[in-house]
């Protein structure tokens, strides 16, 4: 299946404790249907000290399910993603709400 949400996309959270917040996707894990969004779904982890890294409590992003995020359209609202094949045979993502190309 084609990736509707990709690395670098600006997304908005649809549900959960961070509902309504926006951020940039910096990692997508298609096998688990989750993504990591910068500054969203932050958790605290107790880090054991190593030779290169000092120990303590660190904050990091936890994965968020793809069904709980949506791409932000040009108007700043969440939009669904569709696909369109151009005349030259190239497949591009489009915003369902406006019909505008997302990438390409």
Curated annotation (Swiss-Prot):
GO MF term set: rRNA binding; structural constituent of ribosome
Keywords per UniProt: Ribonucleoprotein, Ribosomal protein, RNA-binding, rRNA-binding
Signal sequence segment: none
CC terms in the record's Gene Ontology section: ribonucleoprotein complex; ribosome
Pfam families: KOW, ribosomal_L24
Gene3D superfamilies associated with the record: 2.30.30.30
Cross-referenced InterPro entries: KOW, Rib_uL2_dom2, Ribosomal_uL24, Ribosomal_uL24_CS, Ribosomal_uL24_KOW, Translation_prot_SH3-like_sf
SUPFAM superfamilies, A to Z: Translation proteins SH3-like domain
CDD domains the record matches: KOW_RPL26
Top-rank taxon: Bacteria
Family: Belongs to the universal ribosomal protein uL24 family.
Xref: NCBIfam families: rplX_bact
Description of how the protein assembles with itself and partners: Part of the 50S ribosomal subunit.
Cited function: One of two assembly initiator proteins, it binds directly to the 5'-end of the 23S rRNA, where it nucleates assembly of the 50S subunit. One of the proteins that surrounds the polypeptide exit tunnel on the outside of the subunit.
Protein name, per record: Large ribosomal subunit protein uL24
Gene coding for it: rplX
